[in-house]
């Protein structure tokens, strides 16, 4: 990229409201951008006045590498649900406030998301796995066995 243009695959502007993006299983949203800002480099960049929703069961990838941004969320009230066998290949940046990141990869599943930025967000694992905020990760519980 030239450094002055945006090469986002999907981008909403800061005055957008009530946006919904769904990437179904098998879907692959990608770009190849290592620009120096999240706004310019993120594969998917969602900015919302008060409500935005992204549900990902497919793949969101920045082909410039995992150290570049695949997902950026900004402004206010964006809810991101990362679920099933969906993948985010690249970093996630959070700016603004009042966001929620929900994880639903299945009970006992291991995952890791590199999340940075100065924004505020709540983190939930909808399957009850323990989750760590910052860089979101869960340690797979493997085969659990109950003995009476």
Regions found by a protein language model. Name each.
Residues 1-148:
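Long, low-complexity, polar and repeat-rich extracellular regions
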